[in-house]
């Protein structure tokens, strides 16, 4: 736990200091911070408390980044894991930087988990889906949202593309300021299935294009989506429409 908290606090501090340095030169800079939007479901009655803890813990990096106050449980956890009160108060004092930020939300079929009584975690699929989980993040931080990452393997890609887009439109209709949507990545990945922990050279067909630069069906659908919705204005937010 100490290593986890140390990693978060140093990464977030580096981001905050980098933002300040950039803003000194470009006061009009806008930062999009991409985060994996996760959710843990309890797999048995005795795991409800643990799932609740993990669902609070998922916000820690963004809480520190955006100067959002954490719960009493998370505050005790941070102090017990090596963060000092002075450090925590420093992060809270940086909240003025959030006005230069938007929130990037990544969502995949693997983002929801079920934790079992033996402590093991298994995939839950999209029980809640992008809408519900992103809404949780938006209600917490109240920042403009961009769907910064999503994909599925090629045989499920088209259905998944439109499913994510419909979730995004529903958020927009419900008043969440939406500023963008990205399929990740442009081309297929290698060893994506092991998060690069094992180098096998396995090609994962999740891109809009193959590694040979041939478009997949999802690429044509993505182009269709862009063409059909190109007239849709960016949701009302504090950000100007980009012209270049």
Briefly describe each language-model feature range:
Residues 1-157, 166-244:
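Active-site region of glycoside hydrolase catalytic domains
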Residues 162-164:
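Charged helix-capping and loop-helix junction motifs
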């Amino acid at each position: 736990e100490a290593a986890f908290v140390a990693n978060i606090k140093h990464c977030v501090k580096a981001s905050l200091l980098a933002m300040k340095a950039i803003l000194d030169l470009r006061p009009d800079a806008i930062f999009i911070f991409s985060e994996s939007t996760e959710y843990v479901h309890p797999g048995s009655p005795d795991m409800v408390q643990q799932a609740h803890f993990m669902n609070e813990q998922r916000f820690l990096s963004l809480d520190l980044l955006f100067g959002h106050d954490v719960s009493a449980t998370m505050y005790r956890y941070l102090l017990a894991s090596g963060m000092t009160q002075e450090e925590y108060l420093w992060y809270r004092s940086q909240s003025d930087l959030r006005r230069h930020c938007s929130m990037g939300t990544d969502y995949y079929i693997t983002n929801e988990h079920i934790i079992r009584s033996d402590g093991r975690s298994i995939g839950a699929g999209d029980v809640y889906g992008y809408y519900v989980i992103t809404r949780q993040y938006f209600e917490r931080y109240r920042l403009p949202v961009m769907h910064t990452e999503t994909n599925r393997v090629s045989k499920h890609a088209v259905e998944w593309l439109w499913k994510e887009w419909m979730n995004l439109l529903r958020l927009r209709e419900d008043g969440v300021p939406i500023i963008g949507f990205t399929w990740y990545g442009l081309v297929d990945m290698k060893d994506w299935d092991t998060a690069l922990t094992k180098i096998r050279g396995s090609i994962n067909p999740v891109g809009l294009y193959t590694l040979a630069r041939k478009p997949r069906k999802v690429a044509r659908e993505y182009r269709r989506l862009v063409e059909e919705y190109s007239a849709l204005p960016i949701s009302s937010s504090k950000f100007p429409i980009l012209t270049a």
